[in-house]
Amino acid sequence: MIETSQTIPELVSWAKDREFSLNLPTERLVFLLAIAIYNNERLDGEMLEADLVDIFRHTMNAFEQSTDAIATRANNAINELVKQRLLNRFSSEFTEGLAIYRLTPLGVGVSDYYIRQREFSALRLSVQLSIVADEIQRASDSAEEGVENNESEHYWRRNVFAPLKYSVAEIFDSIDLSQRIMDENQQSIKDEIAELLTKDWQAAISSCERLLDETSGNLRELQDTLNAAGDKLQAQLLRIQDCVIGRDDLYFIDQLITDLQSKLDRIISWGQQAIDLWIGYDRHVHKFIRTAIDMDKNRVFSQRLRNSIHNYFEHPWFLWTAQAERLVDLRDEEMVLREDDALGELPEELQYESLSDLHDQIVEHMQDLLIAYRENNRPIDLSLVLKEQLENYPLSRHFDVARIIVDQAVRLGMANDDLSGIYPDWQVINKRGAEVQAHVIDKY
């Protein structure tokens, strides 16, 4: 795909010839992580064998292992890390038999995964996307300048290809790696929830709710950050791609742009898919809890309640109860189709009104309202228009009314602030706390 890429047979042959292998039991992995942490605290990044022996002694204490022949065992562990290319050993006649050790790129990569890649926050993602946006912006400006001045291939490699490949692509890879770590984190939370459900039910349900809500919130926050920047990044990549269309000598840039577009699409797509999968898991856990309680009405739970009542004066407790409002319970698993024939006439206020009729009425009204703005060249403050119009409709229709108003408004014009990258403030549009985030439409 890119110039430096290798085929699968080439990579297989390369790894086979060098006899690459990794074998890191828990003790060896902990030893490597301890070396990495110690190495980060040193300015020169160099370690003596005595340093490594001391580190090994500390790790063995954590495993409560014997310290007999510690020097020999430490030397064996060091030799294993050197053999697996996790450590580099340097020695010469000037060191008088004292070797110097440095972590290899592989050692740094393995330890970095366990130490520094565990945190994936919206703030970190925002910073990464901000850096990417700046780099792509500079590259697109350079690309347009290169077209105007008919610059040489050297100019394109230095000002367009290099920042995209060595900055933007690496940050995309970092975000992709962080998403994979989030996948692993979700799996660990699932294991924790499964363990909780085998313990005390009152504490388990509360803890499960907290874990489910925290994970859902984190996934949604991160995906919102990605969605906000994704379209703008794709637009900048398309600017660069337009500049190299028809230029056979710049094929390497076109290939790189295609690669970056695919990576960005994959990141955003998987983020949304992860949210959908987690929502499904969330529903599954809640359904499991409800089913377990329903099936256990006359067994374990009732017996626990009897024992608690019997021992109330020795161990007082609070009784928490919950009753679902059945008439407004719209969960999919509790909806039942009814085929009973309805007889008689409904009161006028309960007469059925089709959604298409409602849609046509609202569209006609909103068109008349919004066209007046365009004819007078008045800006449309969507939040204000929504707030005023929703007051005329019952709460059950607010979603459809809001969707129709927004759909009609964006057909009339656009907001200049959309192009500036400024995020609009959230504005409350009804008494139930619904909010909308929209720029003022000021260009028709």
Curated annotation (Swiss-Prot):
Where is this protein chiefly located?
Answer: cytoplasm
The record ties this protein, via Pfam families, to: KicB (PF03882), MukF_C (PF17193), MukF_M (PF17192)
Give the record's GO biological process terms: cell division; chromosome condensation; chromosome segregation; DNA replication
Gene Ontology MF terms in the entry: calcium ion binding
CC per GO annotation: cytoplasm; nucleoid
Q: Which domain of life is it from?
A: Bacteria
Entry's localization field: Cytoplasm, Nucleoid
| Keywords per UniProt | Calcium, Cell cycle, Cell division, Chromosome partition, Cytoplasm, DNA condensation
UniProt cross-references to InterPro entries, sorted A to Z: Chromosome_partition_MukF, MukF_C, MukF_C_sf, MukF_M, MukF_M_sp, MukF_WHTH, WH-like_DNA-bd_sf, WH_DNA-bd_sf
Segments for region (Leucine-zipper): 212-240
Q: Which Gene3D superfamilies match?
A: Chromosome partition protein MukF, middle domain (1.20.58.590), MukF, C-terminal domain (1.10.225.40), Winged helix-like DNA-binding domain superfamily/Winged helix DNA-binding domain (1.10.10.10)
Q: Which HAMAP family match?
A: MukF (MF_01803)
Q: How does it assemble?
A: Interacts, and probably forms a ternary complex, with MukE and MukB via its C-terminal region. The complex formation is stimulated by calcium or magnesium. It is required for an interaction between MukE and MukB.
Protein family: Belongs to the MukF family.
Please explain the role this protein plays, according to its UniProt record: Involved in chromosome condensation, segregation and cell cycle progression. May participate in facilitating chromosome segregation by condensation DNA from both sides of a centrally located replisome during cell division. Not required for mini-F plasmid partitioning. Probably acts via its interaction with MukB and MukE. Overexpression results in anucleate cells. It has a calcium binding activity.
The molecule here is called Chromosome partition protein MukF
